[in-house]
Amino acid sequence: MFLDTAKIKVKAGNGGDGMVAFRREKYVPNGGPWGGDGGRGGNVVFVVDEGLRTLMDFRYNRHFKADSGEKGMTKGMHGRGAEDLRVRVPQGTTVRDAETGKVLTDLIEHGQEFIVAHGGRGGRGNIRFATPKNPAPEISENGEPGQERELQLELKILADVGLVGFPSVGKSTLLSVITSAKPKIGAYHFTTIVPNLGMVRTQSGESFAVADLPGLIEGASQGVGLGTQFLRHIERTRVILHIIDMSASEGRDPYEDYLAINKELESYNLRLMERPQIIVANKMDMPESQENLEDFKKKLAENYDEFEELPAIFPISGLTKQGLATLLDATAELLDKTPEFLLYDESDMEEEAYYGFDEEEKAFEISRDDDATWVLSGEKLMKLFNMTNFDRDESVMKFARQLRGMGVDEALRARGAKDGDLVRIGKFEFEFVD
């Protein structure tokens, strides 16, 4: 089964907790702190595998969670860092943040890797907090929580040339005779319901990939027929072969077909009309095809002024293989002259994550619940909160000093907080002391 979209959740591993421990050995008086740091949590990494052709693996397996780092140990030993969770994806997978819609990465090269969720760093053990004033601290940190996010995956197959046209104009037949692909062929509409891919090799030795897409009909951009759901697979192509049934066997005007399909491509709004098109006049072995072709050329010329270059038209027959060699040579020549079209501006993509905080990032926010409790939130504040070991009094006092240093106390006073008011961070509540 072909699946080209999927929504999944990924959770990187938490960092391991730091340890509070002291050196206790015979003949070693005042051994001092000896608690080690926790290990790093595992990342969730997408790896491109050219052997995959669909996102089917994500249909039933939608949750991916990396292991957490090990806790710090005595004797100053660090916990082991967790292994990264490596998830295989097919070439041509676009990864978006499901919440913001932002493109995180576009994975097109075999072996390409991208970290979609970063593991948390390990918490520090008490050996890290020793100072001349406090040589035996009972302070440690919890591990940093791993990144958690929901992702939208879209597969856009890698092809140099895309075949577009109404249903039953001969796209699948053409693909079957110019490549070794074996698409389903039938004398009814929408025989092709998933994209098919094949490799062409011309007589001159050049090769390129061709994608046969399910047929479009008028109104596809509004969801008629199969809609435009498969047009994402033409986004990576550099040349479009516009297949037209010149026999008019369906009772439609070939030129009206040409206009209708171009309108649907334009409605898709992904600069598809900027790609060079070759008009393929198919079924030239049928009666009246030549007459219809002449009429088509006349109407096409009437809609172009004398200074515009008319699109190239190649009469062929997929059934008798008439004109195929000329068409393929012209397509290969056009491909050589056509650069790749960038789907996304790399400056808009998420950079590899870094650790730390932006200087301009707001450290905390203050709000008030209906029960008059002050509520503190904010990414920086919550990170400090989550890494505080509330089982140790010294760690709690350290967190209080950090809040004071961030200006939380002054901000609460400015908002009208009074001695004894309740303050909540997450599920933790404490009294404000003025």
UniProtKB/Swiss-Prot annotation:
EC class name: hydrolase
Residue span(s) of domain OCT: 356-434
GO CC, alphabetical: cytoplasm
PROSITE patterns, A to Z: G_OBG, GTP1_OBG, OBG, OCT
GO biological process: ribosome biogenesis
Domain Obg span(s) in chain numbering: 1-158
Binding-site residues for GTP, renumbered to this chain: 165-172, 190-194, 212-215, 282-285, 317-319
E.C. no: 3.6.5.-
Alphabetized InterPro entries for the sequence: G_OBG, GTP-bd, GTP-bd_Obg/CgtA, GTP-bd_prot_GTP1/OBG_C_sf, GTP1-OBG_CS, GTP1_OBG_dom, GTP1_OBG_dom_sf, OBG_GTPase
tRNA-binding in keyword set: no
Keyword Magnesium listed: yes
SUPFAM superfamilies referenced in this protein's UniProt entry, alphabetically: Obg GTP-binding protein C-terminal domain, Obg GTP-binding protein N-terminal domain, P-loop containing nucleoside triphosphate hydrolases
Pfam families assigned to the protein according to its UniProt record, in alphabetical order: DUF1967, GTP1_OBG, MMR_HSR1
GO MF term list: GTP binding; GTPase activity; magnesium ion binding
Record localization: Cytoplasm
UniProt: Mg(2+) binding residues: S172, T192
Swiss-Prot/TrEMBL keywords: Cytoplasm, GTP-binding, Hydrolase, Magnesium, Metal-binding, Nucleotide-binding
Main location: cytoplasm
Limits of the OBG-type G domain: 159-336
Required cofactor(s): Mg(2+)
Role played: An essential GTPase which binds GTP, GDP and possibly (p)ppGpp with moderate affinity, with high nucleotide exchange rates and a fairly low GTP hydrolysis rate. Plays a role in control of the cell cycle, stress response, ribosome biogenesis and in those bacteria that undergo differentiation, in morphogenesis control.
Protein family membership: Belongs to the TRAFAC class OBG-HflX-like GTPase superfamily. OBG GTPase family.
Subunit structure comment from the entry: Monomer.
NCBIfam families the UniProt entry points to: Obg_CgtA (TIGR02729), Obg_CgtA_exten (TIGR03595), PRK12296.1 (NF008954), PRK12297.1 (NF008955), PRK12299.1 (NF008956), small_GTP (TIGR00231)
Protein name in the entry: GTPase Obg
Taxonomic placement: Bacteria, Bacillati, Bacillota, Bacilli, Lactobacillales
